[in-house]
Amino acid sequence: MSNQLSLGWPAPAKLNLFLHVNHRREDGYHELQTLFQFISHGDLLDFKVTDDGSLKLHSNIGNVVADSDNLILRAAKLLQERTATEKGAEIWLDKRLPMGGGIGGGSSDAATCLIALNALWQTHLSRDELAELGLALGADVPVFINGLSAFAEGVGEKLIQVSPKEYWYLVLVPDVHVSTAEIFQDPDLPRNTPKLDLDSLMSSPWRNDCQELVVKRYPQVAKTLDWLIEYAPSRMTGTGACVFGEFEQQQQAQDALAQLPSNMTGFVAKGTNISPLELRLAQL
């Protein structure tokens, strides 16, 4: 594969269809119950394998590349160290997802890097081994490596495959960065939602325990959600800032998007229980 370009590796966004905060552990981490679903919108990565062990990242967004702590480069380095491969890579990132939006952009990029380079470098790590590497980069990375919609609990490391309905979504992107760390450190965050079994969770009304706090702290999120909820059942994903509305038909979501005020941005995407990354991997 050396010096050949391998194009079009998707790094899809995810939505938290529900997010419950059960309690804060003594080590500071929070016990959660959440449901992840992929959507048909995300970043794209291209790779060229090299023989000199070097790692280079190019992007359509300069500050992504300038950050030496970039998750893509960290993922590639971890895979090199874990497998002792002498191969390197030149990587191109087409960044389409907002940073700090609660839709998993950085985590998804890291997962796609691990999956793609494991295949292109022929390092032959199993999916479980890749997920273990991914967990060192972020709690959400194993979900993207797993490649299937999943119920997660604990600190996000226990995954059970589920297949929620694949709605069309209108995802809106408020012009604000919400710090996940700040939200989880906030004394006003509810941390006492009782743990429920999966069947009960899947049949109950879905909500996000972080939403009320984020809406109070970030007026832009509140305004965006207030607008969207007039068109469809809507809530926040992750710790925000992105919010999403559920639609039965693509045209309904497109019609709502057409009404979007000029000071708001968003996109329409399809929920999918199999990651677009799986389809790309199958093409090798």
Swiss-Prot record:
**Chemical reaction(s) catalysed:** 4-CDP-2-C-methyl-D-erythritol + ATP = 4-CDP-2-C-methyl-D-erythritol 2-phosphate + ADP + H(+)
* Stretch forming the signal peptide: none
Pathway(s) it belongs to: Isoprenoid biosynthesis; isopentenyl diphosphate biosynthesis via DXP pathway; isopentenyl diphosphate from 1-deoxy-D-xylulose 5-phosphate: step 3/6
Q: What is its EC number?
A: 2.7.1.148
Q: Which family does it belong to?
A: Belongs to the GHMP kinase family. IspE subfamily.
Q: Which NCBIfam families match?
A: ispE (TIGR00154), PRK14608.1 (NF011202)
* Name the record gives this protein: 4-diphosphocytidyl-2-C-methyl-D-erythritol kinase
Protein source organism? Shewanella woodyi (strain ATCC 51908 / MS32)
